[in-house]
């Protein structure tokens, strides 16, 4: 039976056959297309971080009055949705619409969801979406002059939850669809220039992501916390609108390809055949053994037409490549669980540390600015990595593989959450004897008299982990993908990231139940002074440490398999 070109199944990076391209010419003739992709992604990230950077503060404020754990869970659920939708968006692009039109349509959906947040921020339209707030008497409200007659929103009820979750879901669907397709779409612009061009594109793609994060965290988050959330949500809505226009105008210079069928559908059929045909395993395995030469074949080979199955050789080989990659993605779940703490529990911790005033006595340092240090570090280090470190290591044959870089990233993210746990232990001791009140976003927080700058180590460590794990993860997902499964495998990479976010939300809910009680404190909305958040951080560090050991085993096994494959080519 005829099959496709073998290059359709070979990895896109790291192959032996592609001629080297001079470093100065890798983007020649494709600069405008790459610039349009990078600018669109930059603006999209401004919009994304405009939602996520202060969502905990927004929901925990006076208007909505959600508890700190409830606000953190909402953000973790939102992050999970944005990543879980990625494989399905990849399938839609491959099977029906093509990447360009899926990205374009996703940005429209993104914009519709973004428009809901200014509407619920504005008092004139909030009631139409949320109804009237229900008030109930509780004790110990977050006010310095609280009395038994004071009323606050009932902590068990989340005001405006249906409208807010609807907006988060719509935005999440848009974000996830863009995320799954814009990365491989951007790489498509330079993939014919060789692996060096693709590697450098991913470096600059990630650089653009973090520049967008800095713009959003530095400007939008400041406006939200110190000026008004209404203006702070209009800005990201405008940014996603401009991103849509930039991407639309780039159609004339983009390298695009039409939908040519989804390998995701073939993958499901082949795996279903394999699982439902186990009764034929012995006979097919015997046939495989008779046809073996020098290397061991997979049991999935029984699905091939040459072994009595109904599927083409190349399609089965694609699925075999996917099966080898899945364990790596599974091992990354705890990494993402820790990574997403940066915008949730890390922010809760910062709200209960002493935050300095800036510019005037009415403006305070935005809690989200700590996240900006992570992005600034990446902006500085990625160009150094791209221009100096990587070429230096490559000339000497010392450039680590993507899997080795991911392992290093896991180590640094473990150190980050461990540092957060140590800081939280110290904060809980200090707040007992030296408590201060501070006004943040029109809400009074009771904080330890310990400067928020002590959080810098955990943010720096998580930034270093991104340079190793996140960039290498994107590169691995793209390089390990046969050409027919680029969007599928890239989507699965983000899918497992979403699972990591849901795991974090689930763990937070678990440690909040009264039987455990680490985060069970309903007496003060958003207050973590009566909680043991440090235990949660130490739990995450322990899980990541165990997973790092498992990942090292998986990565060594995978690289050995790849080495054998290259020797056979």
Curated annotation (Swiss-Prot):
It is found in: Lysosome membrane; Endosome membrane; Early endosome membrane. It is a multi-pass membrane protein. It comes from the Eukaryota. Disulfide bonds: none annotated. One of its GO terms (cellular component) is membrane. One of its GO terms (molecular function) is L-histidine transmembrane transporter activity. Its main location: membrane. Residues 1-20 are annotated as: Disordered. InterPro entries: MFS_trans_sf, POT_fam, PTR2_symporter_CS. GO terms for biological process: dipeptide import across plasma membrane; innate immune response; mast cell homeostasis; peptidoglycan transport; positive regulation of innate immune response; positive regulation of nucleotide-binding oligomerization domain containing 1 signaling pathway; positive regulation of nucleotide-binding oligomerization domain containing 2 signaling pathway; positive regulation of toll-like receptor 7 signaling pathway. It catalyses: glycylglycylglycine(out) + n H(+)(out) = glycylglycylglycine(in) + n H(+)(in); N-acetyl-D-muramoyl-L-alanyl-D-isoglutamine(out) + n H(+)(out) = N-acetyl-D-muramoyl-L-alanyl-D-isoglutamine(in) + n H(+)(in); L-alanyl-gamma-D-glutamyl-meso-2,6-diaminopimelate(out) + n H(+)(out) = L-alanyl-gamma-D-glutamyl-meso-2,6-diaminopimelate(in) + n H(+)(in); carnosine(out) + n H(+)(out) = carnosine(in) + n H(+)(in). Pfam families: PTR2. Keywords: Endosome, Immunity, Innate immunity, Lysosome, Membrane, Peptide transport, Phosphoprotein, Protein transport, Symport, Transmembrane, Transmembrane helix, Transport. The chain crosses the membrane at residues 46-66, 73-93, 100-120, 160-180, 201-221, 229-249, 322-342, 364-384, 406-426, 460-480, 488-508, 536-556. Coiled coil: none annotated. Proton-coupled amino-acid transporter that mediates the transmembrane transport of L-histidine and some di- and tripeptides from inside the lysosome to the cytosol, and plays a key role in innate immune response. Able to transport a variety of di- and tripeptides, including carnosine and some peptidoglycans. Transporter activity is pH-dependent and maximized in the acidic lysosomal environment. PANTHER family: OLIGOPEPTIDE TRANSPORTER-RELATED (PTHR11654). Belongs to the major facilitator superfamily. Proton-dependent oligopeptide transporter (POT/PTR) (TC 2.A.17) family. This is Solute carrier family 15 member 4. It comes from Xenopus laevis (African clawed frog).
């Amino acid at each position: 039976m005829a099959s496709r070109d073998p290059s359709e199944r070979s990895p896109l990076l790291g192959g032996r056959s592609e001629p080297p391209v001079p470093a100065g010419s890798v983007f020649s003739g494709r600069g405008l297309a790459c610039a349009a992709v990078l600018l669109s992604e930059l603006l999209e990230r401004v919009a994304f971080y405009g939602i996520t950077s202060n969502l905990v503060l927004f929901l925990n404020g006076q208007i909505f009055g959600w508890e700190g754990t409830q606000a953190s869970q909402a953000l973790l659920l939102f992050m999970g949705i944005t990543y879980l939708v990625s494989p399905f968006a990849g399938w839609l692009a491959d099977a029906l619409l093509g990447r360009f039109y899926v990205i374009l349509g996703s940005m429209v959906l993104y914009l519709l969801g973004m428009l809901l947040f200014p509407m619920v921020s504005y008092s004139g339209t909030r009631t139409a979406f949320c109804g009237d707030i229900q008030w109930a008497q509780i004790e110990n409200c977050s006010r310095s002059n609280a009395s038994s007659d004071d009323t606050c929103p009932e902590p068990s009820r989340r005001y405006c939850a249906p409208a807010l979750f609807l907006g988060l879901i719509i935005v999440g669907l848009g974000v996830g669809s863009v995320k799954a397709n814009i990365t491989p779409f951007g790489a498509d612009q330079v993939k014919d220039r060789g692996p060096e061009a693709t590697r450098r594109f991913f470096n600059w793609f990630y650089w653009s992501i973090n520049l967008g994060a800095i713009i959003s965290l530095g400007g939008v988050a400041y406006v939200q916390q110190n000026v008004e959330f209404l203006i702070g949500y209009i800005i990201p809505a405008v940014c996603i609108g401009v991103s849509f226009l930039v991407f639309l105008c780039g159609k004339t210079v983009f390298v695009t390809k039409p939908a040519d069928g989804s390998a995701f559908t073939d993958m499901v059929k082949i795996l279903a055949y394999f699982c439902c045909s186990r009764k034929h395993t012995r006979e097919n395995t015997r046939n495989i053994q008779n046809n073996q030469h020098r290397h061991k074949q997979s049991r999935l080979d029984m699905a091939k037409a040459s072994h009595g199955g109904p599927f083409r050789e190349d399609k089965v080989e694609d699925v075999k490549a996917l099966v080898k990659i899945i364990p790596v993605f599974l091992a990354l779940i705890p990494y993402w669980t820790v990574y997403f703490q940066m915008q949730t529990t890390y922010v809760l911790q910062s709200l209960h540390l002493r935050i300095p005033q800036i510019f005037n006595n009415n403006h305070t340092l935005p809690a989200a600015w700590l996240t900006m240090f992570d992005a600034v570090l990446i902006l500085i280090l990625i160009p150094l990595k791209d221009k100096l470190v990587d070429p230096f290591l490559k000339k000497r044959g010392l450039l680590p593989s993507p899997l080795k870089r991911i392992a290093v990233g896991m180590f640094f993210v473990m150190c980050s959450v461990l540092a957060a746990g140590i800081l939280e232990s110290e904060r809980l001791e200090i707040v007992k004897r030296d408590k201060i009140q501070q006004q943040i976003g029109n809400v009074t927080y009771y904080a330890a008299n310990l400067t928020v700058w002590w959080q810098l180590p955990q943010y720096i460590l998580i930034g270093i982990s991104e340079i190793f794990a996140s960039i290498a993860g994107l590169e691995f997902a793209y390089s390990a993908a046969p050409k027919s499964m680029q969007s599928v495998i890239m989507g699965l990479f983000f899918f497992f990231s979403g699972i990591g976010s849901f795991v974090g939300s689930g763990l937070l809910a678990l440690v909040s139940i009264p039987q455990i009680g680490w985060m069970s404190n309903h007496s003060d909305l958003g207050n973590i002074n009566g909680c043991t958040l440090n235990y949660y951080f130490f739990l995450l560090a322990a899980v990541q440490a165990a997973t790092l050991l498992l990942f090292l085993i998986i990565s060594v096994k995978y690289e050995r398999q790849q080495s054998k494959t290259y020797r056979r080519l």
